[in-house]
Amino acid sequence: TSIIPDMDPTRPAKADPRKLHAAIERFGVTQLFGSPALMQVLATHGEKLATVKRVTSAGAPVPPAVVQRMLELLPPDAQLWTPYGATECLPVAVIEGRELLTLRARTETGAGTCVGRPVAGNTVRIIRISDDAIGDWDDALLVGAGQVGEITVAGPSATDSYFNRDAQTALAKIRERLADGSERIVHRMGDLGWFDGEGRLWFCGRKSQRVVVDDLTTLCTEQVEPVFNTHPLLLRSALVGVGEKGAQRPVLVYELKPGVNADVAEVSDELRHIAEGFVHTGKVKAFLHHPNPFPVDIRHNAKIGREKLAAWAAKQAIKDSE
């Protein structure tokens, strides 16, 4: 039996936690699925979820603090899963919340977000970053161990094409001939990531949202933003690039927590100090406070509209440590 709570499904971040709990208690809900934005609502509300045995959250990375708080609200034997995938291929990989929390320090120092080990049946490989179409698979596309590249997946749930969208199909699909002479389609996720030594996949952000500073420096959103999100006054942040790709200026746009009345110049200075703690974040010199809530996707309310924020940042008078 599926229970649909009293909420606007296009605005999970605005859901009333009291109504969510009312539905959970009335029907004795044991399994819960929701976007990270909905998890944030429940975590902030802070009421125990006594009947829930399994939680699944997908659509965007779940902040470590939200994972920790949700586990505190669940029964000790309950599980919290954060699967990784896309409409074109789901699921790709999965990790349980407790393992994710053991990796929190790595996420908050620039490793990216661990999305777990590939699901059985999937062949997940990392290829060199390119915005061009790739017609046929070649092992020469693969990056070295531990290097960041584009995540690709071949498996039973990967789609072969987009309906009546030949250009998009060419950019997202690679034809691979197997040793037995058969062929399969490899899907390019459009995400950047890498594998650690234990076979776990790490998500580093969308390929289209990477910031290319120069030929030697590319910054990935999920390797930069979690470092700054450790600031106690920040609700979230977004790395954006201003200027042409290949010569972009990295800018960190940030949103303060609701109700916080802070000197944004001081906050920006504190963020600059955080940036200086790591080589990759040291490239970020400009910080902009966004006075309104970030633009987000209508479905999950968790995917940040970085393209819109980049356009907004480009219109601001940017200076170092603004």
Where are the model-predicted features located?
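Generic structural signal for well-ordered beta-strand positions
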Residues: 3, 143, 196, 202, ...
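Conserved AMP-binding/adenylation subdomain of ANL enzymes
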Residues: 1-31
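Conserved C-terminal "lid"/linker of ANL adenylate-forming enzymes
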Residues: 238-243, 251-252, 273-322
